Structures are given as C-alpha cells and as structure tokens.
Regions:
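A contiguous, well-structured pocket-lining segment that forms one wall/lid of small-molecule binding clefts
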Residues: 35
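Extended hydrophobic/aromatic segments used for targeting, binding, or gating
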Residues: 98-119
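Conserved short secondary-structure transition element at the edge of the structured enzyme core
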Residues: 5-9, 30, 38-96
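Glycine-rich loops and low-complexity Gly/Arg-rich segments
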Residues: 2-4, 27-32, 102-106
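Short alpha-helical linear motifs
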Residues: 20, 87-92, 105-106
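Residue-level marker of structural boundaries
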Residues: 19, 23, 74, 97, ...
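Aromatic-lined glycan-binding groove of carbohydrate-active enzymes
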Residues: 1-27
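Short, intrinsically disordered/low-complexity patches at protein termini
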Residues: 28, 39, 84, 103, ...
Length: 119
C-alpha cells in the first residue's frame, strides 16, 4: 500500500513554464480556468526558489520535482505527464537523478518557508 502521486508538477507550475509571469498559449493554465491556485504569489515565490536550487544542481525544475517525489518512501507510483517528447524525456530522465541529503534538506527548507503554497 502506498501513495500514487497525481500532478507531481502542480499542473505544470513546477516545470518552470509559468516563471516571470509567462502564460504559454496552449498551457493548462491558459486553456482551463480554475487551476489558478498553483499560480498564487506564495506558490510563485516557492517555485522561484526551487528553480534556483535545480539550476545550482544542473537539473531542470521538473527533474528536481520528479526526483524528489521518487525519493519519498511512501510513493509507489508517480504519474508523469507530458505534452511533447522533450517533456516526456525530461520526466523519464528524472528517474536516474539521485538527490543528495543536502539537496533534500534545501527542498524541505523551501517548503517550510512557504507552507501550503497552493491551498
């Protein structure tokens, strides 16, 4: 028994596609209203910190998020989503990323500084 992770990239927000106020034309956020909770100011602050951490460690924001999800001992499966082949490859490649204890500690600090960013 375990957890099946659904939307591990917060409807694309943890992919970095919405950074700096961007709203890609055919993105979920642009096409479907009601997902705005993932783009509130607290969430955007957290995403920016995750982006910087990913960059510092030579990975994408999506890879950081997926790799973190995959380290959780209670996760039995992680539903990845992709619109393009590049996104699919990026998500699949996250399986081979090993996060150090230091990176996991930094992820937890970001989370603790931005609790419940997408209520």
């Amino acid at each position: 028994c375990g957890l099946l992770v659904y939307y591990p990239l917060a409807t694309g927000a943890l992919s970095g596609k919405y950074r700096n106020g961007k709203m890609p034309k055919n993105s979920r956020q642009a096409l479907f209203k009601g997902w705005e909770r993932h783009l509130n100011p607290l969430a955007m602050k957290a995403y920016e910190e995750y982006y910087k951490l990913a960059k510092e460690n030579n990975m994408t924001m999506a890879q950081l998020a997926q790799a973190f999800v995959n380290t959780r001992p209670f996760v039995t499966s992680n539903i990845i989503g992709a619109t393009t082949m590049d996104q699919l490859k990026e998500n699949i490649d996250s399986v081979n990323i090993e996060l150090t204890d230091e990176i996991i500690d930094k992820i937890n600090i970001i989370h603790n500084n931005n609790p419940n960013p997408s209520p």
